[in-house]
From Swiss-Prot:
<feature type="binding site">
    <location>
        <position position="349"/>
    </location>
    <ligand>
        <name>Mn(2+)</name>
    </ligand>
</feature>
<dbReference type="Pfam" id="PF11762">
    <property type="entry name" value="Arabinose_Iso_C"/>
</dbReference>
<dbReference type="GO" id="GO:0030145">
    <property type="term" value="F:manganese ion binding"/>
</dbReference>
<comment type="function">
    <text>Catalyzes the conversion of L-arabinose to L-ribulose.</text>
</comment>
<feature type="binding site">
    <location>
        <position position="306"/>
    </location>
    <ligand>
        <name>Mn(2+)</name>
    </ligand>
</feature>
<dbReference type="Pfam" id="PF02610">
    <property type="entry name" value="AraA_N"/>
</dbReference>
<dbReference type="Pfam" id="PF24856">
    <property type="entry name" value="AraA_central"/>
</dbReference>
<dbReference type="GO" id="GO:0008733">
    <property type="term" value="F:L-arabinose isomerase activity"/>
</dbReference>
<feature type="binding site">
    <location>
        <position position="448"/>
    </location>
    <ligand>
        <name>Mn(2+)</name>
    </ligand>
</feature>
<keyword id="KW-0413">Isomerase</keyword>
<dbReference type="GO" id="GO:0019569">
    <property type="term" value="P:L-arabinose catabolic process to xylulose 5-phosphate"/>
</dbReference>
<keyword id="KW-0054">Arabinose catabolism</keyword>
<comment type="pathway">
    <text>Carbohydrate degradation; L-arabinose degradation via L-ribulose; D-xylulose 5-phosphate from L-arabinose (bacterial route): step 1/3.</text>
</comment>
<protein>
    <recommendedName>
        <fullName>L-arabinose isomerase</fullName>
        <ecNumber>5.3.1.4</ecNumber>
    </recommendedName>
</protein>
<dbReference type="InterPro" id="IPR024664">
    <property type="entry name" value="Ara_Isoase_C"/>
</dbReference>
<dbReference type="InterPro" id="IPR055390">
    <property type="entry name" value="AraA_central"/>
</dbReference>
<dbReference type="InterPro" id="IPR004216">
    <property type="entry name" value="Fuc/Ara_isomerase_C"/>
</dbReference>
Amino acid sequence: MKAFKQKQVWFVTGSQDLYGPKVLEQVAKNSEQIVHGFNQSDAISMEVVYKPTVKSPREIYAVCQAANSDENCVGVILWMHTFSPAKMWIAGLNELSKPFMHLHTQFNAELPWADINMNYMNTHQSAHGCREFGYIGTRMRKERKVVVGHWQTNDVQAQVDDWCRAAAGWNESQNLRIARFGDNMRQVAVTEGDKVAAQIQFGYEVHAYSLGELNDAINAVADNDITAQIDRYASEYVISNELFNDEYQLDRLRKEAQIELGLTQFLKDGEFGAFTNCFENLTGMTGLPGLATQRLMANGIGYGGEGDWKTAAMVRIMKVMGQGRTGGTSFMEDYTYNFGVTDQVLGAHMLEVCPSIAAAKPRLEVHRHTIGVRCDVPRLLFTGKAGPAINVSTIDLGNRFRIILNELDTVTPPQELPNLPVASALWEPRPNLSIAAAAWIHAGGAHHSAYSQAISTDNIVDFAEMAGAELVIIDADTRIRQFKNELRQNSVYYGLARGL
C-alpha cells in the first residue's frame, strides 16, 4: 500500500511518428514496464499512472491540460524514450501548471554488445532525446528536477520518491487553509509577513478568527465526549494515578480535552490544515492549549506559536511530505545552548512540541504555565528521538520569501531533565553551532522552525524549486564567507529574476 493513497503522478513518454508503429509499440511497452516497476517498488510512496506516448504538439498539449485539471495528479514525470523534437513541447510546457520531473533513463541498463544494431540505436535514444528536451526546458526557464540513471536502481527510485513527496507538499501548499486565532506576539518582527504575497507564491490562505468564535466551538463540546477523550489519553500516554486522583488536575485535563475537541471541530468545519494562536490573545479561554495543540500536530495539523503562520504552513506541508516515513515533524524553537566539547542546542517551546518526534512514550502531566494566562496546563513531556534531522524556517524579506534549512544531528541528552516541564529535543547543528548559528543569523532565520526527522534536505530543495522560492542550506560543508557571498548573489539574482 502506497503512503499517498489518493495522490498520483503521471508518467508521460515523448516520441514522434517518424519511428513508425513497431518502434512506438516498443516504446509504449517499455514505458508500461517502467511504471509497473515503480508501482511495485516499496521505495516509491505514490502511485505512478501510465499515460500513452505523446508524439505531436497536440497530444503533448492535451496531456498537460489533463494533468492540470486532475485533482489527484500532483505532478508529471517526463521521459524521452526516443528523440522527441522539443519544439513540439513548447505549447504543452507553457500550459502545464503542475511540477514536472525529467527522468533521464533508458529501458535497458546494459548494451547488448554482440547484438546491437541501428534498430536498437534508433529505439533507445534517450541519451540524445533527453538532451533535446533538456534544452527546451532551459530555454523556457522551467524549473524541474532532473533524475539521471537506470530506473531500477535504488538511487534513482529514491530521487523519484523525494520529488513525488515534494510534489505532494506543493499540492498541499496550493490548497492549504490556515486559521489564526489572535495576532502575532506584540513587537515581534520575524513572525510578521505579507499574507497576500505568500498566497501568490505558495498558494496557501491565511484567515483570522476571533477567540469568541473558537470559544463557541469549545463550549459546544458535550461532557460525554470529554470523558471519552480522557479515556483515550489514558490508553496512549503515561499518566500517574496522582493526576486521576487529584480533582483539580483532573478538572484541568477535562478542560484541555474540551479545548482539543472544540478546536478540532472548528478546524474540520473550516477545512483548515494548520492554525496559529498567541498567549497574548486568550480572552475567554481557560489557558493556552498545550496537550490539545500537541495532539493536533500528531494528527497532521500544522502549528505556529505567537501567530507564526509561515511556520504553521511549513509544519503542515512537511507533515504531508513525510507520510509513511519513520520520524516526525514538529513546531520547534531554538531555546537555549549547551556550550561544551560539542556545542548543542536545546530546542523546545512553551508547550507545543509534537509527540511524533518522541523517543519514548510521552508522559502526560499538569504544570504551571507562567506566560499569558497564568494557569496549570496539561502537556506531554518527552525528549526527541536521536538521529539526523532538519530545521526549516521561512521568512519574509519584503521583496521575496527565503527558506533557510539547517541539517542537524539530534542526540540523547546526557542527563535527565527532571525540572523541565516541557517537551524538548537536543541537537548538534551541522557543521557546528558556531558556523550554523552565524549562518542562520546572517540569513535572517527565525527563532521558530519546522523540525523534522521524516523530511530530507532534497525534499525541501525540490519544494523550494517548485515554489520558485530562495533556499539557503546550512550543512556540513557550510563556510561563513562563502555563505555570505551566496546571500549577496541571491539578492541580485532574485531581484533581477522578477523583471526578466
